[in-house]
Amino acid sequence: MRTTSLLLLLGSLMAVPATQAADASDWLNRLAEADRQNSFQGTFVYERNGSFSTHEIWHRVESDGAVRERLLQLDGARQEVVRVDGRTQCISGGLADQLADAQLWPVRKFDPSQLASWYDLRLVGESRVAGRPAVVLAVTPRDQHRYGFELHLDRDTGLPLKSLLLNEKGQLLERFQFTQLNTGAAPAEDQLQAGAECQVVGPAKADGEKTVAWRSEWLPPGFTLTRSFMRRSPVTPDPVACLTYGDGLARFSVFIEPLHGAMVGDARSQLGPTVVVSKRLQTDDGGQMVTVVGEVPLGTAERVALSIRPEAAAQK
């Protein structure tokens, strides 16, 4: 990912009077509903860690409110995903390894009402992306535990034409940007049909009835548990405990897997905005590996990983 100063990004934009600052919340509300109100097709580029890829998307809102969507990577190995109402129907290529909670195009599911406590929201200017007029919003974190965004929203539909994810220094971590967007006609049926290599995805292998007996003793302010479940490990017969957390915009997941005495070391890595931190937790049954994966700063992920405890121990 190329480094870009947030000040330079914002300084090149037209200033908006302070009296319009309250409109930022209105635009975020439009963004939150845009993909359920607009059919479209287009091409966008994705940049992370200096690597670029180009994707085509077909997105159709049906008369009953259901949303059908197909994404196809246009360069490199063929990669495709088809979804209905956010549920993956089929997938192919390397996307199969990126499926869990992956953000495959520039719309993030969030609750606008939660954001004002943890982010400063401002209209900072106007721009033009993919030949379409846009308004520019700065979403700046109030602490060091989350990243900031610069959002260029289509004036006509509220759809995100460009999204920049920025660290605390204003450096670019991730970019989505449409190069072409057509909202004038809904995609045809054949454009939503999967290719022959797209593999049907079965029901998730999770046991939602089992209680997850783990919790975090520390969370970044504003982050709450959004889901907890047990799933089967892809490499062992052991169940893996899964906890997901979010603040209304940012999110991360915690996975706890038995080690049975295996000697596995701690690890940490970052690719663009995504961090992976693994910490060994000593327990009487041979240890557990705690792994935090998400789009939060590395130090935050490490602190969460170190705070994971068995439920009974955490309540003492």
From Swiss-Prot:
Give me the Gene Ontology terms describing cellular component. Answer: outer membrane-bounded periplasmic space
UniProt main location, coarse? periplasm
Q: Provide the GO MF annotations for this entry.
A: antisigma factor binding
Q: Supply the InterPro entries for this chain.
A: MucB/RseB_C, MucB/RseB_C_sf, MucB/RseB_N, MucB_RseB
Task: Write out the transmembrane intervals.
Answer: none
Q: Name one GO biological process term.
A: regulation of polysaccharide biosynthetic process
Task: Indicate where this protein resides in the cell.
Answer: Periplasm
Keyword list (alphabetical) reads: Alginate biosynthesis, Periplasm, Signal
Output this protein's name.
Sigma factor AlgU regulatory protein MucB
Q: Which organism is it from?
A: Pseudomonas aeruginosa (strain ATCC 15692 / DSM 22644 / CIP 104116 / JCM 14847 / LMG 12228 / 1C / PRS 101 / PAO1)
Mind giving the lineage of the organism this protein is from? Answer: Bacteria, Pseudomonadati, Pseudomonadota, Gammaproteobacteria, Pseudomonadales
